[in-house]
């Protein structure tokens, strides 16, 4: 669990838009209210996400001795006003959530707008029913923003500080910027409440510290290109599964899997030997030959060869390109053993008679082996897959580690 700064804050919105969808004349300043436990993500806000099946009310309140109109999900009015410390309000109108779609509110402190979009992840469990959405700071935010054609704005560097072009907070470590952001909202008159909130939050398994969600460019294998996923799913039926339930397990995991992110940012591992253009980000047109060159070097000198080789040793237009420093996903490494073990040993045969591992490998080795083999050879790398259990100690903990 983590104790976070939770805030209710508001986005100004044009009276004309609200008068039209609520069908009522308005006199006070108008706002849409949102709630978050991550104020540091506000520099990345580009949207407000509603649930298009909810009912939203426009209510009049008096806050800080001023009257204002705010939009809230009908089912969350009471809990929101309790956080703000207000007991009295007047309902000015109600409307379905879908009527807000496409409208724009003004960012709480930046000179830009926030598009109102819809997402199924918006619930009435907490908050206001309107989710502040930063495409670069969370999987749900990223997905719903991509669906609506929004830029993936990720204004945070790899060291956890804001980019140099972030107004007000450039260079600040993001978690330490919470106080500054809350103070700025207060100065702009758009902060309604602030409190401590204890909740479950992802932590690094190794360091036990809270993680920071940050969208970064990565390399993917497309599941739809050349029907890779469809072919992989169709191949499952021709494999023998022991126990038999392994077939349904693999089938269901494949049916819901996204594109495969194969890049990792680590100091160890098999490098992704790509050169990309400094301006366009496109890979070099002679990538196949470059990879062959690098592979030959690695066979002679080891993995370090990629880091040591100069770009000018590989291509003539070296000044236009830069090396990728990412490493391959380890599941890609292990997943191609059918090629780098079976194919190069005359005493072995392809496909393998048997792959065997624990049940967690339907998502790991079994799956990565199947996908890479279908991509490379159009056939499964194994005839039979055996899933075994785990030996555990007296407390039920597995002993494999």
Where is each model-derived feature located?
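Residue patterns forming the tRNA-binding/recognition surfaces of aminoacyl-tRNA synthetases
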Residues: 1-43, 63, 99-106, 112, ...
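Secondary-structure transition/capping motifs at alpha-helix termini
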Residues: 146-155, 183-193, 265, 316-322, ...
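Active-site-adjacent "gating/activation" loops or surface patches in catalytic cores
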Residues: 109-117, 323-352, 383
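Catalytic cores of enzymes that engage adenine nucleotides and/or redox cofactors via long glycine-rich
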Residues: 253-258, 263-275, 306-314, 322-331, ...
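Protease-associated
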Residues: 47, 54-130, 139-143
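Glycine-rich (often Gly-Gly/Gly-Pro-rich) flexible segments and glycine-rich loop motifs
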Residues: 274-320
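Alpha-helical support elements that line or immediately flank enzyme active sites
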Residues: 139-144, 368-377
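Conserved phosphate-binding loops in nucleotide/dinucleotide-binding enzymes
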Residues: 133-136, 175, 322-326, 347-357, ...
């Amino acid at each position: 669990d983590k104790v976070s700064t939770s805030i209710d804050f508001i986005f100004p919105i044009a009276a004309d838009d609200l008068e039209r969808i609520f069908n009522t004349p308005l006199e006070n300043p108008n706002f849409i209210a949102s709630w978050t436990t991550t104020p540091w993500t506000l520099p990345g806000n580009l949207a407000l996400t509603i649930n298009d099946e909810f009912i939203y009310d426009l209510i009049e309140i008096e806050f800080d001795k001023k009257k204002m109109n705010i939009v809230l999900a009908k089912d969350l009015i009471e809990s929101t006003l309790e956080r703000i410390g207000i007991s009295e309000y007047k309902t000015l109108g109600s409307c379905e959530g879908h009527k807000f779609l496409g409208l724009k509110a003004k960012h709480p402190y930046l000179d830009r707008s926030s598009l109102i979009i819809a997402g199924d992840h918006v619930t009435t469990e907490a908050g206001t029913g309107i989710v502040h959405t930063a495409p670069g700071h969370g999987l749900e935010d990223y997905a719903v923003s991509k669906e609506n054609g929004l830029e993936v704005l990720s204004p945070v560097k790899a060291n956890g500080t804001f980019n140099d072009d972030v107004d007000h907070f450039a260079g600040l470590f993001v978690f330490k910027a919470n106080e500054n952001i809350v103070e700025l909202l207060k100065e702009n008159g758009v902060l309604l409440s602030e409190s401590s909130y204890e909740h479950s939050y992802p932590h690094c398994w190794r360091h036990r510290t809270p993680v920071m969600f940050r969208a970064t460019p990565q390399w993917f294998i497309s599941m739809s290109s050349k029907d890779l996923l469809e072919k992989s799913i169709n191949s499952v039926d021709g494999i023998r599964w022991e126990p038999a339930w392994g077939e349904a397990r693999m089938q269901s995991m494949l049916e819901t899997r996204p594109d495969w992110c194969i890049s990792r940012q680590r100091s160890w591992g098999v490098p992704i030997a790509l050169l990309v253009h400094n301006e366009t980000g496109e890979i070099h047109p002679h990538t196949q030959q470059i990879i062959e060159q690098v592979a030959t070097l690695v066979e002679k000198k080891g993995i370090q060869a990629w880091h040591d080789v100069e770009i000018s040793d590989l291509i003539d237009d070296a000044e236009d390109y830069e090396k990728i420093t990412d490493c391959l996903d380890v599941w890609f490494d292990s997943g191609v053993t059918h090629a780098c073990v079976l194919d190069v040993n005359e005493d072995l045969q392809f496909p393998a008679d048997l792959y065997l591992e624990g049940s967690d490998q339907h998502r790991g080795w079994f799956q990565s082996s199947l996908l890479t083999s279908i991509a490379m050879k159009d056939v499964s790398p194994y005839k039979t897959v055996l899933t075994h259990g785990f030996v555990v100690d007296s407390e039920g903990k597995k002993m494999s580690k």
